[in-house]
Amino acid sequence: MRIIIESITPEMRRTYDYDNLERVYAEYQNRVVDDEPVMSSFASKMAGKKVLLLAPGVTLRTESDRVQKYIAHENPIVIGVNHVPDDYRCNCFFFANAQRYQYAVDTNANEMRRADVIVTSNVRSVKVGANVVNFNLLAKRGWRFFDNGTIMALRFLRKVGVMDVAFAGFDGFPAEDSRLCYANRVFQNDLSMELKRAINEDVLSMLRDFQALDKGMTKLSFVTSSL
C-alpha cells in the first residue's frame, strides 16, 4: 500500500485525496494489543544474547558462506525478517508485513510452526501461536518508508534487552536496475530507481537515528555487504 501511494505522481495526488489516504494507511496500522506478556517472554529468552537478523536481500545466497561461518562461530539466535529464508534454520521469525506473513504461512507452514513467530499488530490475519506486538511501539514516524521490517525488528530487540545484533541480507536496493534485490525471486518488484533510492535513504537515516538514540549501547555488525 505504501509503495503504491509513493509511486503516485504529484499531479495525481492533487487530483485525488492521496495524502489523506496515506494518513488513513498509518491509522490503519495502529491496532493496539496487550503485548506486555510477549515482550516479557522474549526479554527472558533473548536479553544478553547475540542475535542475527536475516533480512531478505540476495546476499543471503551470494554470501552464504560468510553467514554460515558467522552462525557456526557465534551461535546467535537467528531471526528471519519478513520471510522464511532458504538454507538457514531460524530460531524465530519477525513479520511486519501482512503479505509476507501470509506467504510464509502458505509456503512454509512447518517452519512457522516449529519456530517462534513475532508479528506486529498491523498484520490482522494472525495464526494461533503467533506473538503479536504493537506496531506503534516499533514504528517511528518522520520518514516516508517508516515501516521497514528490519529496522522494526532492531527496535524490538533493543526493547527486550538484546545488545549485540548482526545483520545479513540487509542489502538495500542496488544501483543497477537489473540486479536481483532479494534472495527469493518471488519478492522481486519493478519499482523505479528513484523510489528505490528514496527507500535506501530512509532506511539508512532510520538506522542512524537508532544509533544516535542508542548512544552506542547496542553492538551492530554486518555479516554481508550492506547499505
Give the role of each language-model region.
Residues 1-227:
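Metal-ion/cofactor- or nucleotide/acyl-coenzyme-handling active-site neighborhoods
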